[in-house]
A protein has these predicted regions:
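Conserved N-terminal phosphate-binding loop of PLP-dependent enzymes in the Aspartate aminotransferase
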Residues: 1-129
Length: 129
């Protein structure tokens, strides 16, 4: 089974495809670093993560009990995007065959979900303002 999988990867040039789309993935992920909730954005190939911060200027994290990461994950899911919250980090890992258009859709939904989470953070009084 593993050898057949490797054969398919080679026939379909999956690694070459990842090389072609990973730049766009990284650019779209880095654009979200400008969002008020995001303190850090990082990517390697088609894996990426956003670290959510209470205060991005001072890199102050939210309290674990605030559950901002799970709240953002829930909003992503409600909007049709599956991500994984690991604490207050949102992990993105699309299929290796994803297209530039699908990457745009992923990050458009992520941005909308972050906006909704930012509103929720304000409503919950989780920021000192």
């Amino acid at each position: 089974m593993a050898l057949e999988t490797l054969k398919i990867y080679e026939e379909r040039d999956v690694v070459g495809h990842v090389r072609n789309v990973m730049g766009h993935f990284g650019e779209r992920l880095q654009k979200l670093a400008e969002h008020p909730l995001v303190g850090n954005a990082r990517a390697c190939g088609l894996m990426g993560a956003l670290e959510l911060m209470k205060d991005k200027a001072t890199k102050t994290p939210f309290e674990a009990s605030d559950k901002v990461g799970p709240a953002a994950e829930g909003r992503c899911l409600e909007n049709g995007l599956i991500v994984r919250a690991i604490g207050d980090n949102l992990a993105f890992c699309p299929p290796l065959i994803t297209t530039d258009a699908e990457i745009d859709e992923i990050f458009d939904i992520a941005e909308k979900s972050l906006d909704e989470t930012e509103k929720w953070v304000g409503e919950q009084g989780l920021r000192d303002t």
